[in-house]
Amino acid sequence: MYEHSKKSQDLAVRLQRFMDEHIYPNEEAYAHQLKAAENRFAPLPLMDELKLEAKEAGLWNLFVPEEHAEYCDHGGLSFFDYAPLAEIMGRVIWCPEVFNCNAPDTGNMEVFMNYATEAQQREWLDPLLAGDIRSSYAMTEPQVASSDATNVELRIEKAGNEWVLNGHKWFITNAMYERTKILIVMGKSDPENPSRHLQQSQILVPKDTPGVKLVRPLTTLGYDDAPIGHAEIIFENVRVPLDNILLGEGRGFEIAQGRLGPGRMHHCMRLIGAAQRSLELACHRANSRTTFGRLLSKHQSVREDISKCFSEIEMARLLLLKACHKIDTQGVPASVDMIAATKTTIPFLVQKVIDRCMQIHGAGGLTEDYMMAEAYNYARWCRQADGPDQVHQMALGKQIIDRFSG
């Protein structure tokens, strides 16, 4: 059940080689370019160089699923076969963009594949697949509990041959990035509809549209996640053509449900890679540092921590692969239980793993000298992103209880 296809295994070997030759040796250079940049949200020259090399190596758009094989050169991958590749990429927080496999663009590209018109695909999907532009998904709002997607208040009103948007969004990933050109915006177009799930629509808004105001970059645990950033945005009388609606009026919630499930899985895949690398670094540290006359690796408490980390990573990986297998064989709608279990379990486990590995590194584990502090921030962020743990646990608990209610 858990043996990956030969195509996936071959890609994993090539991807690991690329990481060894191009990514790990450039981690310090990337950090230096980012710190030296006059504009932290501008594209970095090193990133563009690495993207060209990844394209030439045939390691591009690896996220594209089998059913959309026409959009990639590798023939598409199942969730199960993509998992080990995303795990490898997750070992360096910024490197998924090198392979055009970064959030939220992967999810947004799948939205365009599944729900956009041919004209919308030509205008936005094609340059996204080429890596020429980036995108944002504007859903979360500061004034309401956006974990309930039906709460969104941004208004979408029809005025002649245009949609007019007014509202307030925040934590919109990618929106600060200069290369981001298109926002997928969710809001209420029919607030009086008796069905709460038919009140929303999703509208395509070019970022340079008059009335789109980037208020500020937001931080998570002090990280601004440059150069992509998480923005607070105000939409003030933003006007776009009627053709900029996705799928149709009242279909916004449907699109959100179709988009967010796979995105949650991708985050968990990458997090396992971050946890695995943290464990490896902790083991190297334990074998090289001495306290009280003994290597750290000789201390019982360190061995216990390493044991817990190993076990929790294995648990997380197996849970993820079972969820991937169910998605591949039964589809996303039938797999919401496993997606919820994965989404609520893996970020929490990874956060614990990285915390122990940081502790083994002493004060250095808290610094930018190692990847763990940023990875910890990513894991903690994932417990809120795409819906907080509690919402998914509530829905999953109800689903499990209902199975045994009759």
Language model: regions and residue ranges:
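Short, conserved phosphate-binding/catalytic loop or strand-edge motifs used
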Residues: 102-109
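Cytochrome P450 core scaffold surrounding the K-helix E-X-X-R motif
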Residues: 73, 146, 214, 244-249
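Flexible, small-/acidic-enriched active-site or ligand-binding loops
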Residues: 151, 210-239
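Short glycine/proline-enriched turns and hinge-like loops at secondary-structure junctions
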Residues: 77, 147-150, 175-180, 195-198, ...
